[in-house]
Amino acid sequence: MKNFKIRQETKEDLDEVYQLIKTAFETAKVKDGDEQDFAVKLREGKNFIPELSMVAETDGKLIGHIMMTQTPVLQSNGERYTALLVAPLSVQLEYRDLGVGSALMKEGLRLAAEMGYQAVF
């Protein structure tokens, strides 16, 4: 599927993103049931990076979402660095297996590299 665009999430998207995450995880094999609330908490936290919270959109409808947040990493040699965590990554059921999730990941990784991040988990 190529008829969608990826863009940064806006404040106007937040209610729709909340519902998208909730609905997408209803059919997930592994879920807690509160992934949408987890995303809200991440967005309110100090490790949130607005540029790395993106949506996939087609015909004015949000069909996918990805969020990456910072996390400190302590290496075995004692050195520390900042990496990124991907969570959540959501795609509406009817748009799965069409490349939406892959496109969100690719764009997220591209932007993360541009911003100087060297690791994403």
Regions found by a protein language model. Give the residues of each.
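Conserved N-terminal entry element of GNAT/NAT acetyltransferase domains
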Residues: M1-E12
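A conserved beta-turn-beta hairpin within the catalytic core of GNAT-like acetyltransferases
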Residues: P72-V86, R96
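Conserved acetyl-CoA-binding loop-helix of GNAT-fold acetyltransferases
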Residues: V86, V91, D97-R110
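Conserved GNAT acetyl-CoA-binding A-motif
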Residues: M105, R110-F121
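Conserved beta-strand segments that form the floor/walls of ligand-binding pockets within enzyme
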Residues: V55, M67, L85, S90, ...
